Amino acid sequence: MLRVRAGSVHPVTAPPISDGAVLVADDGRIAAVGAHADVPLPPGARRVEFPDAVLVPGLVNTHTHLELTHLAGRNPEREFSRWIRTIRSLKDATTPEEFDHSAEQGVRDCWTAGVTCVADTGSTGAPLRALARLGARGIYYQEGFGPDPADRAASLAELQAAVVRLGHVASARTRLGVSPHAPYSVSEPLYRAVADFARRESLPLAVHLAESREETALVRDGAGSFAEALRARGIPVRAHHCSPVQYLLQLGVLERATGWLSIHCVQVDERDLDILRQARVGLAHCPRSNRAHRHGTAPLAAFRAAGIPVGLGTDSVVSAGDVNLWAEAAAAGLDGEDALRMLTIAGARALGLESEIGSLEAGKQADLAVFPATVLHRPPPSSTALLTVIAGRPVHGYIPAQ
């Protein structure tokens, strides 16, 4: 067993506890949360104390690209379509071993930042393998691509084969999902096919959606840089005269999939918000990445007012620079307990994991993080955790043997 005491404990779903403690059972779940004097210290339990720090639920990063960790600082391009082409070139020059090392470093960087659960999208499978090898928690969404309708069958078969291979790696802690990448990289028939596949196999699904003005121009008007690139490849493009969110509704895919995570959702209006709410979609808000690419500002307040589950994500380190979720919260205009809620239980709800993680409650998974008390002030001086624990196992920081 493990007992962690801190100057203040923040359960998130209950008021903060001054001089509090959390007791972790041998099964990796929380046995007790309360004032220090009320939480027992069983014989033989390990104990650690942080009198000047805050103990919080482990942070939840709702959107990462861990396989790109090694590319930090290597793509100065900010015009979005050119940035994407540069990323593809850099990935083409990366070996499978380099992707594996990159993803593992990304997981460790998350632990250093107090992140205990990630929702990662990628094309190589390296993030899922890294999560499984290191005993991390997360959902990995295997990306599917195929903008040409003529390639639907081949693109779907490629994605399904990847899911079969990776299915042997997935577990209850490291889950597998699929991601039909984005409206500019996935055709209408492929969207429908992947959504049907996800529903049949009970796989969570994530999509980059309404991220950029270029994407909106493609869907609404059949114009812009994405449309030009597709036509240059001989791929037919037509105007749908609607927003990207409304486009997916028209395709029927919002009804075809369960566990849907929409990433970014910057270019949205009130009708889009109503669609997302009715579809019970979770959102990943990535303000630093949106700012880096000059996409605009997602309407976070409107998301929350509409009752749409939304968490914060760092996107790739190529865009945001690091996996500092406190900096992400500051970029979203949040601080204190409001920031903490967004980084924990709100993110867990966006991923459909709120019954297991996101708050400090007896019976939940013992995913914990300890930070200097100053982390609850904006801007955070440091995102480095003093201690990070996943399912009762310390993965970052020091715990005495006895």
Regions from the PLM with identified roles:
Residues 251-256, 285, 296-373:
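His/Asp/Glu-enriched, well-ordered alpha-helical/loop segment
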